[in-house]
Amino acid sequence: MEKIASFTIDHTKLKRGVYVSRQDKVAGNVITTFDLRLKEPNNEPALDGAASHTIEHIGATFLRNHKTWADRTIYFGPMGCQTGFYLILAGDWKAKDIVPLMQEMFAYVAQFTGTIPGESAVECGNFRFMDLIQAKEEAGKYFTEVLDNIAEKNLSYPS
């Protein structure tokens, strides 16, 4: 089998950031998959599963209700390695194009109060697996240390 595109990225050089992971054509339309890397692979502890699950619920709800991006949002969810999230948007986008959206979303998660969207047995298959406090900490850290004044090195995969 051929190696998938994400395995061709040198994860020993990968920093936290916002990256275009791939672009595909579906029925003649471009979709862009983004790598939202919250943790430096193999150098930082991975995201806590419950925190990641909470960010997924709040982030997906935010995106699907966003006045500009709702109709372009296809998917938002955690990476299996627990170092970040994938965001799939309809359209031909560059990483810098979505930085304002990511700043808005991660600030929203960091300041979130109230009931976590989908936090019930009826709405989620593992609704007790949530940690709002840690989710807010991780979102705030990503916003402050990466998204706010993001550098070019955090927008392009290492060569």
UniProtKB/Swiss-Prot annotation:
Keyword terms, alphabetized: Autoinducer synthesis, Iron, Lyase, Metal-binding, Quorum sensing
Entry binding sites for Fe cation: H53, H57, C124
PANTHER family: S-RIBOSYLHOMOCYSTEINE LYASE
GO biological process, one term: quorum sensing
Gene symbol of the encoding locus: luxS
Record has Repressor as a keyword: no
Gene3D superfamilies: S-ribosylhomocysteinase (LuxS) (3.30.1360.80)
Listed cofactors: Fe cation
Name the UniProt record assigns to this protein: S-ribosylhomocysteine lyase
Organism: Desulfotalea psychrophila (strain LSv54 / DSM 12343)
Record's subunit section: Homodimer.
